[in-house]
From Swiss-Prot:
Species for this entry: Caenorhabditis briggsae
UniProt KW keywords: Lyase, Metal-binding, Zinc
Role noted for this protein: Reversible hydration of carbon dioxide.
Protein name, as recorded: Beta carbonic anhydrase 1
InterPro entries attached to this UniProt entry: Carbonic_anhydrase (IPR001765), Carbonic_anhydrase_sf (IPR036874)
Cofactor note: Binds 1 zinc ion per subunit.
Length: 270
């Protein structure tokens, strides 16, 4: 806590005045362009590596950047009472956000734990909120990791029953560069996108092309940021060489000229 208090003092001396001016501007012209679901890991600093300013982006953080799937496909009688679906409704239905980004990372402690629980089921603690959270929301990701480890770096299908337009294919770690846990982390990003697509209140937005779901991944070891390319079916590092093709893909897949879709995502992540 002393570190936090000292940090507030430095904030008061060096940052507060400029930040208050930004708050004043945003209060008159709020224009967030995306909502990002990312991990609570202290090494993950999404506003840093996206260079986002005040008012640019909603950020929702939890263990493992997970978004619970809707409890029943097509059911209007049941509501998933969780922070994440509520945040989606706030951002998309009420805030008119058109881009949702799920961002995972390497050496994710939540993914490491999920993998360990699968390797040794007896470690599962029924009284642990963490274990229950991971098992409930990471089960499909774990199934897909098993498939990936069995078939190797081949095409895998991610299919949405509620919003078929959101289905896609992916090749996870084609160069066999990452550990099983990091493969799981990348798979989990894509599976959480599928989970988002299960929510009926988003179906019309998705099917009409008014909402776009993106997968990103951060390598904490070298600071590189990756974006999932549906064209290439893999995570692609964002750098000067790949920006033109990634931007072109986003502009084609996210035809929203009023907010320059390709620029929104790439500029936020690059």
């Amino acid at each position: 806590m002393n570190r936090i208090i000292r940090g507030v003092i430095q904030y008061n001396q060096k940052i507060k005045a400029g930040l208050v001016k930004q708050f004043e501007h945003v209060s008159d012209h709020p224009n967030p362009t995306a909502v990002m679901f990312t991990c609570m890991d202290s090494r993950m600093l999404p506003t840093r590596f996206t260079q986002s300013a005040v008012g640019d982006m909603f950020v929702v953080r939890n263990a493992g950047n997970m978004i619970p799937a809707a409890p029943n496909y097509g059911s209007y009688s049941e509501v998933s009472i969780n922070t994440e679906p509520a945040a989606l409704e706030l951002a998309v239905k009420r805030g008119k956000i058109r881009h949702v980004v799920v961002c995972g990372h390497s050496d994710c402690k939540a993914m490491n734990t999920l993998y360990q629980l699968h390797q040794c089921p007896t470690k599962f603690d029924v009284s642990s909120p963490m274990d229950q959270w991971l098992r409930r929301n990471g089960f499909e990701s774990m199934k897909k990791l098993n498939e990936r480890l069995h078939i190797g770096p081949k095409t895998m299908k991610f299919e949405s029953e509620v919003a078929p337009s959101q289905s896609f294919e992916a090749i996870i770690d084609p160069m066999e560069k990452w550990s099983a846990e990091d493969k799981l982390s990348q798979i989990n990003v894509l599976q959480q996108i599928m989970n988002i697509s299960t929510h009926e209140f988003l179906k019309d937005y998705l099917e009409a092309g008014n909402l776009h779901l993106h997968g990103a991944w951060f390598n904490i070891y070298d600071g590189e940021v990756f974006l999932f390319s549906k064209d290439r079916k893999r995570f692609v590092v964002i750098d000067e060489k790949t920006v033109p093709s990634l931007s072109a893909e986003l502009e084609r897949r996210c035809p929203l000229p009023e907010d320059k879709a390709g620029d929104v995502v790439i500029q936020n992540l690059h």
